Structures are given as C-alpha cells and as structure tokens.
Curated annotation (Swiss-Prot):
Keywords assigned: Glycoprotein, Glycosidase, Hydrolase, Membrane, Signal, Transmembrane, Transmembrane helix
Gene name of the record: CPM1
Complex formation: (Microbial infection) Binds to L.sphaericus BinB subunit of the binary toxin BinAB.
Pfam families xref list: Alpha-amylase
Record organism: Culex pipiens
Protein name (Swiss-Prot/TrEMBL): Alpha-glucosidase
Length: 580
C-alpha cells in the first residue's frame, strides 16, 4: 500500500462527499432567469371607460401578473406623443400620454409592481423623437442650443435629398423643411426625425432623461431600434442590395445607416452608468436592446469584441419568432437555438422572445394546436423568457381590426372575460376592435378550465423557479427530424427533460441515450392535449407523443444517490491505491 493510509483516504472521502453535497451553483441576478411580460398600454385595460387602456388599468392587474408567475414587465412607450406611431414618436420624454394618466399614476404603478414582486421596465426610443417635440421646433428655428439636436443636410447639388437613403417604411429617409431650408433625416416616418448623437449636448440630455425615470423607481430600459442611432459621417449613398423594388427599404444594403460602431460605445457607456447607479442604490438596473442586425452585430451589444466593455444585459433574440413556424421540424428548431447559443459570449444570458407588438401573435404564426408547444419550449430553455400580453390565453391576430397600422391585428384589446369588450373596457367602442373569439379565449374562461393554455403557462412559470431551471446546464438533441429534446441538469438537483413532437402525427421515441437519466421519469408538465398526464410515470425508452405534443419530464435526484455516486468514485480511487 502507498504511504497514504486508509484513515487518510476515508477522511478524504468524507470531505469530498461533504463538499459535493453542499456546493452551491453560481448565484444568478434577477434578470438572468426572469419571465418578462410585455404590456401595450393602449390595449391592456381601460379603467375609465374611454375605450383606451391606461396606467390605472395596468396597476390594477399587477397581482394578476404575479399570480401567473411574471417577474418583470416592460411597457411599450407611455410617454406623451401625437401617436403617429402610437407612442414611438415621443413629444415629451418626461411626461405621460394624457390618455394613459399622469406621473402620479405612473408612480402608483411602480409602487404596485414592486409590492407584488414585479420589476418594471420602460421602452425607450433613443433614435428619434416626434416632430412635435420642443427640441425639433427649436432646431427648425436654428436655436443655438438645439440647432444640431437633429440630423440636417442641405439639398443635393441640383436639388433633392442629400443622398439615396431610404426609410424603414419605404420612400426617402429625408424630408425638406422649408422654414429651415434643409432636409432632416428620418429613418422611420417623416414625423420621427432622427436625433443627432454626434452632438454631446443631445447625448447628455437623453442620458439625463434615463435617470429621471430611474429615480422614479424604474428597473431598466428596452432600447428600441438601437442600431439606427448613428449614420455615416460622410453621408455616402448606400449600395443597391439586389433585393426588393426601388424605393423599398430592402432595395439598399444599409451599411451607412445601421450598426455603426459609435452605437456600441453609447450602449457601453450607458451600461457603465447603469452599473454605477445599481451599486449606489443596491438594486440591479438592466438594459435590453432591440436591433435587427447580423448575429455578429447583435452579439456586440452584450460586450465589446475585446471583452473589456459590457453592454446590454440582454439583446432581444427573435429567432423563435422567425424560425418556429408551422412547417418547422426538430432539426431546424435545434439549429435556430444553436445559432444564438453558439454565438453568445461566455457568461451572458440568452433571451427568448415569443411575441411582440411588431410581430404576428404565436397562435396566428404557428396555429392554435402549437401554442402550448411554444410556451413549453421558451419557458424551459436557459435564460430569460419574454411573453407578449395575451399569449397566456392564446390570443390571435384580428386582421379586420386594422385601422391605423398593419400591426394593429396583433395589438387588439386584452381578452379578460366574456363581458362587454372582453372585459377590457365598459365601452363598446374601443380604440381597436376586440377579437370576435374573445368569449372562448379569455382569462376568466381559461382560469376555470384546468386543461387550458392559461394553466399550462402558469405551470411553466412556476417550474422556472426551480434551481435547475435557473442555474442548470443544458444539452439538446433531435430524434430523427420530428422530435426535439432538451435536458436541463444541475448537480445535486432534479433534472428536467423537455420533449417536443414537431410533427402532426403520433410518435413513439427512445430517449434513453441521454446520460445520467433513469429509464422511468415522472411527467412534471404536460400541455393540455398531451398524451401524457402530469404526475404519471413514463418510460423514456418508449415515450409516446401526440401530434404537436410537448411534455416536461422530471428525474428526482436524492441526496443519497449523489453521495452514492461520490462514494463509488472514491472507492475506485482507493482500490487503485490498494491494489496497484
């Protein structure tokens, strides 16, 4: 026997087993495993009967959000606006749109949110303001303080716009202002002039505004259309892309109006200031970015290429919106998830967006028979889930509601119950028409039905509170082209296996090649129409899944099992010392 004695070996064994049993996973901050919920204020709840949602209505539903497992909510812009783009054209960043309430109402909302354990985020639009903003009016008049707050250029030689730039909504990105005698840039509508971030005073004013809302208790910001903030300083023509028709946004390759490096520096500086504020106040303030960009450009919002500067806590990840379609299979789904996870810098948090005010609703994109599947996936993937209001009751687009914008169909009033205007308002005339199927798809009806999308959503958000879901690793694979499986595991904790049948036919699959899983597992969550039932035991070597089915299976890991594993390992080590 080697010099190490038996007593020493047993002491080592005891110490190691003890260490393995009590080791804690890395601590996670609140946002790293949160369930976010986007509220479109105009459509959530009308408290005064004018047919328009408001802050008081949102405030009254904070307990509801807490009950369904929401950790944080972000509001589409509640700021004062002429509503040419329904709040994304801000005329006063320091005031609330009168239809929604006032600052007192906002303060009550923040208080009620925090009382219910919910963080409150604001949608912040840094790229532009309304053309009715005081700054723009003064800039037109060449007020020395505000003259360069916007991007102005003289007409091109011979007249006309300064260059060939096209707005996101089509047509020239330049509009001539006769009073000033120059063109102003607007990457969106002519009523949304671009702010000039090359002007230090403008940048200082916008930063000051962020702290105004932080001091009112806001927990962070979603930075809308962030990659449009800067333009090429030489204002060069953009090359033709070969896509789209002349005059359409896609007809140009936007190398001079998007993803300019200066954008990232502003985000990194704002992150530095948010972190400093967080340290002073003892609460984590976060930044989220929305940018339709390349994967390389998007990942730079997390951190700089040299990893010395931190940016957004989470860029928005829209891949599930784009890739989880009716025709998607398991291989394509896995590739979509890998696309984000394999490009994300180490130690950062992924986000998974199911829907938003700019996109068709889940039920309309994938069909009512697959809504529960999407909910299962996004709530069991690692990181943050981001849900759009009404997805918990499978709300659908309503094309006939379109009145102001082609995105109106997915912005219709929240469906609370079967009463007048779906319980959204006592007024029969609401700002957008209510979806006609509201009597079937609403909170009240689904709350009373334990086999509903609502309860499925609630079960999943509750499961997200488990330590494995918050801090565990993930492994995922496909079984053929039809079945996708995702394993979440954390040493010393129960493991969870999410399984999705992406096909419209029943299938029986063998998932036994996942290591460290027992052959028999318990069904933790099953979608309402599943072949499986919560609480039942199943054999993962022959798991039967219904069409478009999804289940979450649980493998219980006892402390005794963990100790036995450690003892087995160390006994093998002892044997090596004894018999070699």
């Amino acid at each position: 026997m080697r010099p190490l004695g038996a007593l020493s070996l047993f002491a080592l064994l005891a110490t190691t087993v003890s260490g393995l049993a009590i080791r804690e996973p890395d601590a996670k901050d609140w946002y790293q495993h949160a369930t976010f919920y986007q509220i479109y204020p105009r459509s959530f709840l009308d408290s005064n009967g004018d047919g328009i949602g408001d802050l008081a209505g949102i405030t009254s539903k904070m307990k509801y959000l807490a009950d369904i497992g929401i950790d944080a909510t972000w509001l589409s812009p509640p700021f004062k606006s002429p509503l040419k783009d329904f709040g994304y054209d801000v005329s006063d960043f320091y005031a609330i749109q009168p239809e929604y309430g006032n600052l007192t109402d906002f303060d009550k909302l923040v208080e009620e949110a925090h009382k219910n354990g919910i963080k409150l985020m604001l949608d912040f639009i840094p790229n532009h303001s309304s053309d009715q903003h005081e700054w723009f009016v003064k800039s037109v008049a060449r007020d020395p303080e505000y003259s360069e707050f916007y991007v102005w250029k003289p007409p091109a030689t011979g007249g006309g716009p300064p260059n060939n730039w096209i707005s996101v909504f089509g047509g020239p990105a330049w509009t001539y202002n006769a009073a000033r005698g120059e063109y102003y840039l607007h990457q969106f509508t002519p009523q949304q002039p671009d702010l000039n971030y090359r002007n230090p005073k403008l940048l200082a004013e916008m930063t000051k505004m962020l702290f105004f809302w932080l001091d009112r208790g806001v927990d962070g910001f979603r930075l809308d259309a962030i990659n449009h903030m800067f333009e090429d300083e030489q204002f060069r023509d953009e090359p033709v892309s070969g896509w789209g028709q002349p005059g359409e946004y896609d007809s140009l390759d936007h190398i001079y109006t998007k993803d300019i490096p200066d954008v990232y520096n502003v985000v990194y500086n704002w992150r530095d200031q948010m972190d400093k504020y967080s340290a002073e106040k003892g609460r984590t303030i976060i930044l989220m970015t929305e940018a339709y960009s390349s994967i390389e450009g998007t990942m730079l919002y997390y951190e700089s290429a040299d990893r010395k500067r931190q940016g957004a806590h989470m860029p928005f990840n829209f891949q599930l919106i784009y890739d989880f379609k009716k025709e998607q299979n398991a291989v394509g789904l896995k590739s979509s998830i890998d696309w984000w996870m394999n490009n994300m810098p180490a130690r950062h948090t992924p986000s998974w967006v199911a829907g938003s005010h700019d996109h068709s609703r889940v039920a309309s994109r994938v069909g009512l028979d697959r809504v529960d599947q999407v909910m299962t996936l996004m709530h069991t993937l690692p990181g943050t889930s981001i849900t759009y209001y009404g997805e918990e009751v499978a709300m659908q687009d309503f094309k006939e509601a379109q009145q102001f914008d082609n995105r109106d169909p997915n912005r219709t009033p929240m469906q609370w119950d079967s009463s007048t205007s779906a319980g959204f308002s006592t007024n029969t005339n609401t700002w957008l028409r209510v979806h006609p199927d509201y009597a079937r798809y609403n909170v009240d009806v689904m709350q009373k039905n334990p086999q509903s999308t609502f309860h499925h959503f609630q079960h999943l958000t509750k499961l997200r509170g488990h330590r494995t879901m918050q801090s565990g690793e993930y492994v995922h694979k496909t079984v053929g082209t039809k079945v996708y499986a995702l394993l979440r595991e954390l040493r010393g904790e129960d493991s969870f296996l999410t399984v999705l049948n992406m096909a419209g036919a029943e299938d029986t699959v063998d998932l036994g090649d996942f290591v460290n899983l027992p052959q028999k597992m318990r069904v933790e969550v099953a979608q309402p129409n599943s072949k499986s039932k919560a609480g039942n035991e199943v054999d993962i070597s022959k798991l039967t899944l219904g069409p478009y089915d999804s289940v979450v299976l649980r493998a219980t890991v006892s402390s005794a099992a963990a100790i036995n594993l450690s003892i087995g390992l160390l006994l093998a080590i002892m044997a090596r010392y004894i018999f070699v």
